[in-house]
């Protein structure tokens, strides 16, 4: 039984009913509607921490979805799951795939920066200082790109860029 049919949460159930109504009236293909249903079930499973189920739904959605922007969000969510599981290389792979389809996705740029910053911190703690600086520089590059797309977001990243001397712009917003 699809997750959307067994949801106990009133708000999620309401969202599902609304999404189903919208899907019925939208002039889109049956394949796109099925892809969205898988995507919606993937988001629901992900929100519940059911990552294996979410990944199955996202993979099914990817097989059906043809729209590049919609595919980018599916790939992004797969990246989120891998990042949550500490699988940084896999997460980076999916975030980059999402950006290939949708280069104006600041949240993917931010998450790539967060991973590179984390890897830099790990390298720094292990006294691999040159490697740490390379990771920090990569993080800075991705944060700058994210901030350019969403200047009012990522305030902590903006502060980090300034305090580490990696900012070439005084104020982003």
From Swiss-Prot:
It is a peripheral membrane protein. SUPFAM superfamilies: TPR-like (SSF48452). GO terms for cellular component: plasma membrane-derived thylakoid membrane. Keywords: Membrane, Photosynthesis, Repeat, Thylakoid, TPR repeat. TPR repeats lie at residues 35-68, 72-105, 113-146. PROSITE patterns: TPR, TPR_REGION. The keyword Repeat applies. InterPro entries: PSI_Ycf3_assembly (IPR022818), TPR-like_helical_dom_sf (IPR011990), TPR_rpt (IPR019734), Ycf3/AcsC/BcsC/TPR_MFPF (IPR051685). It is found in: Cellular thylakoid membrane. It comes from the Bacteria. One of its GO terms (biological process) is photosynthesis. Belongs to the Ycf3 family. Essential for the assembly of the photosystem I (PSI) complex. May act as a chaperone-like factor to guide the assembly of the PSI subunits. This is Photosystem I assembly protein Ycf3. It comes from Thermosynechococcus vestitus (strain NIES-2133 / IAM M-273 / BP-1). The gene is ycf3.
